[in-house]
From Swiss-Prot:
GO BP annotation list: D-amino acid catabolic process
Xref: SUPFAM superfamilies: DTD-like
Gene: dtd
Motif (Gly-cisPro motif, important for rejection of L-amino acids): 137-138
Superkingdom in the source lineage: Bacteria
Name of the protein in its database record: D-aminoacyl-tRNA deacylase
Record-linked PANTHER family: D-AMINOACYL-TRNA DEACYLASE 1, D-TYROSYL-TRNA TYR DEACYLASE
Domain remark in the UniProt entry: A Gly-cisPro motif from one monomer fits into the active site of the other monomer to allow specific chiral rejection of L-amino acids.
Tagged with keyword RNA-binding: yes
Cited InterPro entries: Daa-tRNA_deacyls_DTD, DTD-like_sf
Organism this protein belongs to: Shewanella sediminis (strain HAW-EB3)
Annotated family: Belongs to the DTD family.
Enzyme kind, highest EC tier: hydrolase
Amino acid sequence: MIALIQRVTQAKVDVDGKTIGAIDKGLLVLLGVEREDDSFKMEKLANKVMSYRVFSDENGKMNLNVSQAGGALLVVSQFTLAADTGRGLRPSFSGAGTPDQAKVLYEEFVAFCRAKGMPTQTGEFAADMQVSLVNDGPVTFNLQV
């Protein structure tokens, strides 16, 4: 399971010209599900995303997690993160989870974060989305479990 996280000052996701999820300060989480992923990996990754210290403390050191910084999550499904780009000029998605598997784990990820008290907005699974963001830093990390 893969989460590409970006520290943002604002982010939003639109579907059919309508904003369906938006945050100010926080993390944009692009979430990719791989074929071998399960609920155990989902929980491990969700905890890592919520605990990862990428926000600056009073000394300017990356020492605060999203909750400590008063931020929120915007979680967007992105199966292309599971692409194999090692050969040729076209990505292979053979390692990506099936749509049914990915939807279940995506929804579990969101529900888990919300159950932990994390303010969480979402995109729409499998929709054609337009994601806008202001990357703060820029700060971007690729987390995998």
